[in-house]
């Protein structure tokens, strides 16, 4: 008897792989079927005749196998196979493959991905602004990464910083305390916070929950809220605070192609884009401004058709964009700010600080925590060893829902935290032992629903 190999799924006239394949097939996740092949595959599992095996050709032995040759997918970490180098495993990333040396595709790609730093321009120093009270702005959550960024910009570079906080209903107590302590510790920072009305937020969250099985809208909804503020204050730079593991995770999740990491430095492409702007009598864009407009327009008007056709759509952002449509009035100020800034050229440049470089070569989580505790009064979450995503009470719920959707092949999106903790352990952001401890104690990779899901539903069901 034959069947479709584990982690392959028939969708229309293609077989799609849900997992992370070995090099060089890492992103070769679809196989197109002929009509005859599709007819045969649709009736699996069953015995196959010699003629049917001949029609299936090279699929047999790869995507189509004898029933006893199907790979077993573990149902817990205890049964998982782990990478020899990092902590990637075939439970938290079902369908991940390993080479003959026991390395996962993330570790197989170390040399190929070493220069993939950011999909927006990298800047580690900034000039003083001549047109604004603020040199830079950041979105501040009270978490580890945004606190370190705020410390670096205000205390190390001694810049005037605008810190913008979206008060989500799930903000952790430790994050709230960290924000208050930062206000007392960082004298060159001005803090602004905003809260979406419960009526609007529940409309958005209910739609997002229907699409994604969680309500995580960060940071997209914060962009919607605060872009008009950035334009009104003529802030020259909006600085992102994503740590290296998060940025590289986009590549392995097939959300950002290699070219996306080189585009920020492509003067030729920006030149061509500016030629088009010249015909509409608009000022040329400077470094990082294209990325700002592209991001804000995506949120205001929806995803790029070209990007979707190329197969690099971001399911998470797409779902957030769809959910925001449930409260359309929230987009009006954003759309006005986009039009005004595009006409005037007063566009805050979207840039990223290289956390590895500014922290001495490796963004070591424990050392970073020590710095921000000392300099900013940062308060660690209850699970004090936790290093990933430290500001939200329902982070585990997001991890659980992303994991469950991927495990059961309802989504092609690999759980973000699964990739990030694996990349971080490979890149010496934390030791393999510490990463393993965080994986087992602090992350939401469970086939059973976890308590944090009740916290999420409690808000949207009121």
Feature-to-residue mapping (PLM):
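Acidic, low-complexity/disordered tracts enriched in E/D and polar residues
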Residues: 1-42, 77-80
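Short, exposed beta-strand/loop patches in secreted or surface proteins that constitute
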Residues: 6-10, 56, 96
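Hydrophobic residues embedded in beta-strands of well-ordered beta-sheets
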Residues: 13-15, 64-65, 104
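Short acidic, hydrophobic short linear motifs in intrinsically disordered regions
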Residues: 36-56
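A short, conserved structural fragment
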Residues: 52-76
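Nucleotide-activated chemistry modules centered on ATP-dependent adenylation/adenylyltransferase
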Residues: 78-101, 105-136, 152, 156-462
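Short, glycine-rich nucleotide/cofactor-binding loops
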Residues: 136-145
């Amino acid at each position: 008897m034959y069947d479709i190999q584990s982690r392959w799924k028939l969708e229309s006239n293609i077989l799609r792989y849900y997992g992370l394949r070995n090099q060089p097939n890492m992103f070769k996740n679809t196989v197109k079927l002929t009509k005859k092949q599709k007819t045969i595959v649709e009736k699996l599992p069953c015995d196959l005749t010699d003629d049917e095996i001949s029609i299936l050709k090279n699929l047999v032995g790869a995507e189509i196998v004898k029933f006893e040759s199907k790979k077993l997918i573990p149902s817990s970490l205890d049964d998982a196979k782990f990478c020899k180098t990092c902590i990637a495993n075939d439970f938290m990333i079902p369908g991940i493959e390993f080479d003959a040396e026991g390395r996962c595709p993330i570790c197989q790609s170390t040399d190929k991905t070493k220069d993939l730093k950011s999909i927006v321009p990298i800047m580690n120093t900034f000039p003083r602004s001549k047109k604004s009270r603020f040199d830079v702005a950041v979105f501040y959550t009270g978490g580890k990464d945004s606190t370190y960024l705020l410390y670096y910009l205000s205390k190390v570079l001694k810049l005037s910083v605008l810190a913008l906080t979206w008060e989500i209903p799930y903000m952790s107590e430790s994050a709230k305390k960290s924000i208050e302590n930062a206000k007392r510790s960082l004298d060159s920072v001005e803090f602004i916070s905003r809260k979406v009305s419960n009526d609007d937020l529940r409309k958005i969250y209910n739609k997002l929950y229907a699409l994604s099985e969680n309500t995580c809208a960060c940071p997209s909804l914060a962009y919607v809220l605060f872009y008009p503020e950035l334009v009104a204050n003529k802030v020259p730079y909006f600085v992102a605070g994503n740590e290296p593991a998060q940025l590289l995770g986009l590549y392995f999740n097939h959300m950002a192609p290699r070219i996306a990491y080189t585009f920020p430095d492509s003067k030729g492409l920006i030149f061509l884009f500016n030629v088009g702007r010249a015909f509409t009598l608009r000022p040329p864009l400077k470094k990082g401004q294209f990325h700002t407009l592209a991001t804000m327009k995506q949120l205001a008007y929806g995803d790029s058709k070209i990007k979707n056709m190329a197969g690099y759509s971001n399911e998470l952002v797409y779902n957030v964009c769809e959910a925001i449509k449930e409260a359309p009035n929230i987009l009006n100020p954003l759309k006005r700010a986009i039009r005004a800034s595009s006409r005037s050229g007063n566009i805050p440049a979207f840039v990223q600080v290289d956390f590895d470089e500014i922290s001495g070569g490796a963004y070591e989580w424990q050392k970073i925590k020590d710095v921000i505790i000392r300099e900013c009064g940062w308060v660690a979450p209850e699970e004090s060893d936790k290093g990933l995503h430290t500001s939200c009470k329902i982070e585990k719920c997001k991890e659980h829902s992303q994991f469950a959707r991927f495990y059961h092949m309802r989504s092609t999106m690999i759980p973000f935290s699964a990739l990030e903790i694996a990349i971080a352990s490979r890149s010496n952001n934390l030791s393999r032992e510490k990463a393993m401890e965080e994986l087992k104690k602090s992350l939401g990779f469970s086939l059973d629903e976890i308590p944090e899901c009740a916290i999420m539903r409690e808000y949207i069901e009121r």
